[in-house]
């Protein structure tokens, strides 16, 4: 074994790339480290494409092993199971920038597996995973237009920070990941605290500049460890067939793309394509229809893009910066805690908000440690939303990714636990889709939260931008349709408030996207965002003054932390009885905070009364109504508060001489007693006769 190692300084850490020792039967394997966080990246590609395949089968699997953090998995089987949400999101983060770097026409199956084998709790594994993937693909020999660099950018005290630690991210106003080649940004994913457009653009440029050291190092690593590039050539097009298809279909496709209703447009496009195939088969029965489909797709793309570059109206008749018609409704469902229906053109989201207690929060145990998520946002994309049939079940990668993007857009305006002690779950059901459904989810979530009475700081809206670029000519499109996303060069999603950006996601399919183009897109997105916010605010401009009658109401009280054990009781008996008998949910915190949740106000009051009784201190000189719980020869024990008993000595039962306690008192008898003393050991001395004397005096 002859290891080849490349090390370089990157931000606050040393990055090391090593190959030649582990997983030597893979086409490429790189052990990549950043500090103590280490990942093993393997790449395997098939030398031949499967016959009849018309797509590129790239699979990226990212897996976190609990042994990397010195943990044993939970559950019955004590081993890792299905991918977590975090693993799914990081797999998508790696997939998105590498996919456009494989050549057009390359349809060989490629699988990338990233395994986290060691983790430093202060260094997240996503950036080193992207760097390791780039290095492994670079040395594999598989056709790949890399190397690719990656960087995380924070913004702390007005300064950009390269690859901030987990502790630094806690104080950062920005968490942005940018990936790209030496000459182009390909992918951006970020969450921000309503930062201005110029700060966001600056962070993208900063991250791309800083990652040049990674790209240079991987190029040097490839020169030393790279395998010969595969002998692969892109399939050639039949020029005569291209000309035939253009003659048969170009005019028809141009007319079809003037139809503004999506389903009608798709139907007409299908008619044109079917007629073209029929004509071609008539002249050549042995023609390859898969090749015809590919060439029709290329012509379709050329027709749509040409119209936009020439300044003609878009597919649905809009100008480049126009937003589709908006419809905004809040409070559309009677029994949910909050709801909204947001419609933008042919994209629609039905969004609901549900309030719960702290125990309803999501508990996440990952290799980076345990955390609690009080705000959850789930995105569902059923097949009927695009007029199709399909499987319905657990969320797919795309649904998880879109939900997380919408979550990032809203999280910056959510109230703290001290301001609003509820767990919040939002569900966005995409009921119609023609582009930008994740941004419709952002708008619908903002509305549903306000309808539920959640005191978010301000409204949030999202917009998806697109780009068509031919040579030096380009057009930035606002509020793109699904077709414009598919046929364009960029998908640029921006969510934010009037004051700034809260989430930014960008995927670019071509090189040559300049800072100028990104700046134009951000400024155009700002105008669109403000327009949408104005319409949203007409429906509901601020949160409801009160939460829904159907939502649990949480009342917060404070008790002496030393009394927590009294409220819990032996084996949890006291708190269990409290919750069962009052019908409330009670949560205790170590600092003495008690949260009582119930949709019944009287039940909450009863729970508070009983907790106050349990936790109250015995006051010397005060008269209590107690119950006799035990009789002994020298007196009786009386319960005056939950868990608080005292002794009435035989001499304190009556002014008269008492020979037998049972002649004056019986078990479960209610008596008024006065607290005479509480000694250092907490023992309580009571008197019945003193209580009677005091009551008599008060009566006079």
UniProtKB/Swiss-Prot annotation:
Catalytic activity annotation: RNA(n+1) + phosphate = RNA(n) + a ribonucleoside 5'-diphosphate
UniProt keyword RNA-binding present: yes
Gene Ontology cellular component annotations, sorted alphabetically: cytosol
GO biological process: mRNA catabolic process; RNA processing
GO molecular function: 3'-5'-RNA exonuclease activity; magnesium ion binding; polyribonucleotide nucleotidyltransferase activity; RNA binding
Record: residues binding Mg(2+): 485, 491
Protein localization: Cytoplasm
Domain S1 motif positions: 621-689
Pfam families the record matches: KH_1, PNPase, RNase_PH, RNase_PH_C, S1
Catalytic EC class: transferase
Record-annotated KH domain positions: 552-611
Keyword field: Cytoplasm, Magnesium, Metal-binding, Nucleotidyltransferase, RNA-binding, Transferase
SS bond list: none
EC number: 2.7.7.8
Cofactor: Mg(2+)
Domain of life: Bacteria
Function recorded in the entry: Involved in mRNA degradation. Catalyzes the phosphorolysis of single-stranded polyribonucleotides processively in the 3'- to 5'-direction.
Quaternary state and interactors: Component of the RNA degradosome, which is a multiprotein complex involved in RNA processing and mRNA degradation.
Membership in a protein family: Belongs to the polyribonucleotide nucleotidyltransferase family.
Protein name, entry field: Polyribonucleotide nucleotidyltransferase
Gene: pnp
């Amino acid at each position: 074994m002859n290891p080849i190692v490349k090390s370089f300084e990157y931000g606050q850490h040393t990055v090391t790339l090593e190959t030649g020792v582990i997983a030597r039967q893979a086409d490429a394997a790189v052990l990549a480290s950043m500090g103590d966080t280490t990942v093993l990246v393997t790449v395997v590609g098939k030398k031949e494409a499967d016959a009849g395949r018309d797509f590129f089968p790239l699979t990226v699997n990212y897996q976190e092993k609990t042994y990397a953090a010195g943990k044993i998995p939970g559950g019955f089987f004590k081993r890792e199971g299905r991918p977590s949400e975090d693993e799914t999101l990081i797999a998508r983060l790696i997939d998105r920038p590498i996919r456009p770097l494989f050549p057009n026409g390359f349809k060989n199956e490629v699988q990338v597996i990233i395994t986290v084998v060691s983790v430093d709790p202060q260094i997240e594994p996503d950036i080193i995973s992207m760097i390791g993937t780039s290095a492994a693909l670079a040395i594999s020999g598989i056709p790949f237009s890399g190397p690719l660099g990656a960087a995380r950018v924070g913004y702390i005290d007005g300064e950009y920070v390269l690859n901030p630690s987990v502790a630094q991210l806690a104080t950062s106003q920005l968490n942005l990941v940018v990936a790209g080649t030496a000459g182009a940004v390909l992918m951006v994913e970020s969450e921000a605290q309503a930062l201005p457009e110029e700060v966001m653009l600056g962070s993208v440029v900063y991250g791309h500049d800083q990652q040049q050291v990674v790209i240079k190092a991987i190029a040097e690593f490839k020169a030393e460890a790279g395998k010969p590039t595969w002998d692969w050539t892109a399939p050639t097009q039949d020029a005569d067939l291209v000309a035939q298809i253009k003659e048969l279909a170009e005019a028809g496709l141009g007319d079809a793309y003037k139809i503004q209703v999506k389903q009608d447009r798709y139907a007409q496009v299908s008619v044109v394509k079917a007629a073209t195939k029929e004509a071609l088969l008539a002249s050549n029965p042995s023609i390859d229809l898969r090749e015809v489909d590919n060439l029709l797709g290329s012509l379709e793309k050329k027709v749509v893009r040409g119209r936009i570059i020439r300044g003609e109206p878009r597919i649905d008749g809009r100008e480049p910066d126009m937003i589709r018609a908006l419809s905004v409704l809040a409070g559309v469902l009677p029994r949910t805690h909050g709801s909204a229906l947001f419609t933008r053109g042919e994209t629609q989201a039905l969004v609901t908000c549900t309030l719960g207690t702290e125990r309803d929060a999501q508990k996440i145990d990952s290799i980076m440690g345990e955390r609690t998520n009080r705000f959850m946002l789930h995105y569902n994309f059923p097949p009927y939303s695009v007029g199709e049939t399909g499987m319905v079940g657990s969320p797919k990668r795309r649904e998880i990714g879109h939900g997380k993007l919408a979550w990032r857009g809203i999280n910056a305006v959510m109230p703290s636990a001290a301001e609003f002690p509820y767990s919040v779950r939002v569900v966005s059901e995409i009921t119609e889709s023609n582009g930008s459904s994740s941004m419709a989810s952002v708008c619908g979530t903002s509305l549903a939260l306000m309808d539920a009475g959640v005191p978010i700081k301000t409204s949030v809206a999202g917009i998806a931008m697109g780009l068509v670029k031919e040579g030096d000519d380009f057009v930035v499109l606002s509020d793109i349709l699904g077709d414009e996303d598919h046929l364009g060069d960029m998908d640029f999603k921006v969510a934010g408030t009037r004051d700034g950006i809260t989430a930014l996601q960008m995927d670019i399919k071509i090189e040559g996207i300049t800072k100028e183009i990104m700046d134009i897109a951000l400024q155009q997105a700002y105008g669109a965002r403000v327009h949408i916010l104005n319409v949203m605010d007409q429906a509901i401009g601020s949160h409801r003054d009160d939460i829904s009658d159907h939502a649990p109401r949480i009342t917060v009280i404070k008790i002496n932390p030393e009394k927590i054990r009294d409220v819990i009781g032996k084996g949890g008996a006291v708190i269990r009885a409290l919750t069962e008998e009052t019908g409330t949910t009670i949560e205790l915190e170590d600092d003495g905070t008690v949260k009582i949740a119930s949709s019944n106000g009287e039940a909450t009051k009863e729970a508070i009364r009983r907790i106050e009784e349990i936790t109250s201190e015995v006051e010397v000189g005060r008269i209590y109504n107690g119950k006799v719980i035990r009789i002994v020869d020298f007196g009786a024990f009386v319960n005056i508060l939950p868990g608080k008993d005292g002794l009435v000595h035989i001499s304190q039962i009556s002014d008269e001489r008492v020979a037998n306690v049972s002649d004056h008192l019986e078990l479960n008898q209610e008596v008024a007693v006065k607290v005479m003393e509480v000694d250092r050991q907490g023992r309580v001395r009571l008197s019945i006769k003193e209580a009677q004397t005091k009551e008599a005096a008060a009566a006079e």
